[in-house]
Amino acid sequence: MRNLNRIIFINSANIPYADDIYLDGNIHFIGTQGVGKSTILRAILFFYNADTQKLGIPVEKQSYTEYYFPYSNSYIVYEVATENGPFCILSFKSMNRVCYRFIDSPYRKEFFIDEESRTAYSGTDRIRAILDQYDVDYSRIIYTYDEYRNILYGNEAGADMQRYALMESKQYQNIPRTIQNVLLNSKLDAEFIKKTIISSLNEEDTSVDLNTYKAVSYTHLRA
């Protein structure tokens, strides 16, 4: 079973550091206005849809990239649980847009933060050097949202990237749209969810793990 297990903020969205936001079950965010509920939900939504224009951010507010990645050492790390152990997706700003690197390891604080100075490493080259030091495999930098989504949803990703797929589906587009509608409180009916599942399963040349699909399309939508 594969699912988003945890989200880690490092110098992101006015959060100096937070690594205890677990998403491995039914989650209920509570709190008064301005405490960060929407901040967390938008970061979760961006994991699934990778679309800065469809996060429900008002036009008068800072963009997703500006707000979540104000510094050269601002990061959001997504930890994904799989049947073979967790992996991480590092998101960061480069050339004024969000980029990604897939890391074949569960989240470890020492990969991103200097233990002596207790500050986050500035720039991904330093993080890459630390990963090499710990002999951890990682992907090249993913510069486009389309490629990120194709990897995440197993849509013709290369053999070296298949380990990082939540599922395998060429017709995955309705999945992030469904999650987007739920998190943004948009209209969503049972018929649309049914069509989403059918369209993703109705593929002759694609292997789909039903348990994986249920975990993403049902468990997270209940959260």
Predicted regions and their residues:
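Glycine-rich phosphate-binding loops of NTPases
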Residues: 86-183
